[in-house]
A protein has these predicted regions:
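Membrane transport/envelope proteins' first extracytoplasmic loop
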Residues: 1-257, 266
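Interfacial "coupling" helices/loops that link adjacent transmembrane helices in transporter permeases
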Residues: 9, 14, 258-298
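Juxtamembrane/interface motifs at transmembrane-helix termini
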Residues: 40-41, 276-277, 308-309
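Mid-sequence acidic-hydrophobic segments that form the walls
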Residues: 132, 291, 304
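Hydrophobic alpha-helical transmembrane segments that constitute the membrane-spanning cores
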Residues: 251, 295-309
């Protein structure tokens, strides 16, 4: 009974220490939960978004354009999903826009705010630029001398990290954005570039596919999704959050444990006579060790309970 009464008295005598240790525990657990939830959330959202919107396995360009009537043959021969993607870069005063013609099979865009396009004078634009430059739904943007009404914002899987060029170091959402318009409006721009998107199946011969494409159409550039920063940055950010979560989970409690060890060690030295008296009263070494261990566990238990509540 004597030892049990000492718990409350010890806490009162060393209140500032117990409060500080409990606060450190609370901070460590909260930071862990926040970063862990953020990391797993980003990872889960990205993976599902990639699936829903048919993320590419690779993008490539060629010196010789692949005829449209060859696409079906390529898909059958190599057991791949293959699509020619049309786009055009347009420089306007204060911004640069990359307008895409809508894909049907690979790297589909998803309107996340507002509505999709339905008329030739409407566009949807990438969400990052809209938020950065305060472009509201209903505003009008000029593209190649014609005004288009913004009807919504979108994301697409191969541009979740908005790099204008794949070898850029930093994203650009202040002067560069993506846009979609109707096919007829896109055709009216009268200027277009193309690149090719491919999704391999489990039994696709990737090496043979690339070899044949190069022999027939002379590949200019080839970028696999695992080397595409616009895509991999999502996983990289998720991993960064998860690493930080476990760094907080281990480092802050270690600091707390070190502080507790110092304080409890000093307390044991100060109470040597009392420990001797308690031993004489019949308390075993094991009971005394448990007593001081409980004193050390109080801050951690208190912090854990506070976070749980």
């Amino acid at each position: 009974m004597t030892l049990n009464k000492r718990y409350l008295r010890n806490v009162k005598e060393n209140l500032s220490f117990y409060v500080a240790a409990a606060v450190l525990t609370v901070v460590a657990l909260l930071l862990f939960y926040l970063f862990y939830i953020a990391g797993t959330g980003i990872k889960s959202y990205g993976d599902q978004f990639f699936i829903d919107n048919k993320l590419e396995d690779a993008t490539f360009t060629t010196y010789v354009e692949i005829p449209d009537n060859e696409i079906t043959n390529i898909e059958k021969k190599y057991n791949v999903t293959f699509e020619k993607e049309h786009y055009v870069n347009i420089n306007e005063d204060g911004y640069k826009v990359r307008v895409f013609k809508r894909n049907k099979k690979i790297d589909l865009y998803e309107v996340i705010d507002g509505n999709d396009i339905s008329n030739d004078d409407e566009i949807v634009i990438s969400k990052g630029y809209a938020e950065s430059e305060h472009v509201s739904i209903g505003d009008r943007l000029t593209i190649k001398g014609k005004e288009y009404k913004v009807t919504g914002y979108f994301l697409r899987p191969d541009y979740l990290y908005m790099l204008e060029n794949t070898d850029d170091s930093y994203k650009n959402i202040t002067s560069f954005f993506l846009a979609y318009m109707t096919d007829s409006a896109y055709d009216a721009l009268e200027a277009s570039s193309c690149q090719y998107k491919v999704v391999y199946s489990d039994d696709s011969d990737v090496t043979q596919f690339r070899k044949d494409m190069n022999e027939q159409y002379k590949i200019n550039s080839y970028l696999a999704k695992d080397n595409n920063q616009r895509i991999t940055m999502v996983d990289d950010q998720a991993i960064m959050f998860l690493i930080m979560a476990f760094v907080f989970l281990f480092t802050l409690p270690l600091i707390t444990v070190a502080l507790i060890a110092i304080i409890i060690g000093r307390k044991i030295k100060q109470e040597q006579k009392m420990i001797g008296t308690l031993s004489a009263l019949g308390y075993t070494k094991r009971q005394l060790m448990w007593h001081y261990s409980v004193l050390a566990m109080i801050p951690g238990l208190a912090g854990g309970i506070i976070v749980t509540i």
